[in-house]
Amino acid sequence: MGLGYLCAWRATEANGIAMMWAMIILVSIGTGFFKGNVSGINGRLFPLADQDELDTVFNLQYMFVNIGSFCGTTFLSLIGTNAGYRTMFLVCGIFLFIDCVWWFVGMKSFGDAGKKPFLVDNRSENVEKADKEKDNAPLTKLEKNRVIAILIVTVFSGIFWLIWYMAYMPVYYEFGPVSQGGSGWANWNIGSFEMPTAWFDSMNGLLCIILCPIFAGIWAKMRQRPQGDWGMFTKTAIGIIILGLCTGSMVLAAALSGQGTKDPVGIWVIILASVCMSLGEVIFSPLGNAFISKYAPKKLLGTMLGVWPLIIFFSGKAYGPLYNWLGNFDFVKAYGVVTIIIVACGVIMLAFTKKFDKMVEGK
């Protein structure tokens, strides 16, 4: 990833297209090697007996990820606007090389986690038994059901991320201030200060930093109840429904502003949209890696952890065309339908949570 950003740093008018594609390819490959395996190692740092702690662990991991997101959108964006984007890419590359050194120095603290490929179930066995483990046995019926359950959660998470990413577009281009390229449906002023639209990204990162440890505590408390914590499917469904409140708030704000024909609505719509997006995200997204670490068959762990970011990639590719297509229709009607569909997806998943839970528990 660091090499990718250095390619962008060296981009010129003559080689810019090639260097930017080099950056995209290298960063994508680096992310593929890095992201899923880091989550796998984090999952293996905790023994099988403490698997319920994984929800808390991955909530905290998600918090630190969003510290990076918040700092990047808040501070690195200032480097881009003041010193140029090539300088910003150079700084990104330097940080990643520092991170690489930090990783190698800190590897000794991982113990046995990550020393062997995820073919051995060292969640419950000593890693020294790795070479003796037979990994060519077919999947059991329970393992197949768990793979299906993981894929179901992943598909619904893809729906969530598709709408989540797309929600940024009306915030910027319909509700954004005219001075920043928007249509001015909302007033971004705080007193005499006009909030930069880039801070909407920062707001999400900041809210995730605040909410992740809070929800980690909530899940820990809920596990102590006689009925236990909510399952992954319930949390995913609730996260999707809350995201529906985000698009619903935009529909209300668009109607109040007359879609630009009346006075702009207050900044409340921006804040409410960000809160709903962040709440929906924090309720289920950090737990995806925990869920996969708990239930993925040992020899498919790395692959299944890679499927999670893969579906996010497809959502990231699809939201732009979807936003452009919705632009052909009346905003209130189009996004009203989107709200109904996303809430319906959450309700459908909520209705089948018991069946899905039985699939992963083998009941």
Range-by-range predicted roles:
Residues 1-16, 238-262:
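C-terminal ends and interior cores of transmembrane alpha-helices
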Residues 4-5, 23-24, 93, 99-100, ...:
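A generic transmembrane-helix signature of 12-TM secondary carrier transporters
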Residues 78-94, 228-234, 324-343:
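A membrane-interface helix-boundary motif in multi-pass transporters
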Residues 33-48, 283-296:
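Intracellular juxtamembrane helix-capping segments at the cytosolic ends
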Residues 48-50, 55, 76-199, 215, ...:
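Intracellular loop-helix junctions on the cytosolic face of multi-pass helical membrane proteins
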Residues 4, 16-34, 259-283:
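Hydrophobic core of transmembrane alpha-helices in multi-pass small-molecule transporters
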Residues 1, 221-241:
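Cytoplasmic membrane-interface "Motif A"-like loop-to-helix N-cap segments
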Residues 53-81, 93-99, 204-208, 302-319:
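Glycine-rich segments within core transmembrane alpha-helices of 12-TM secondary carriers
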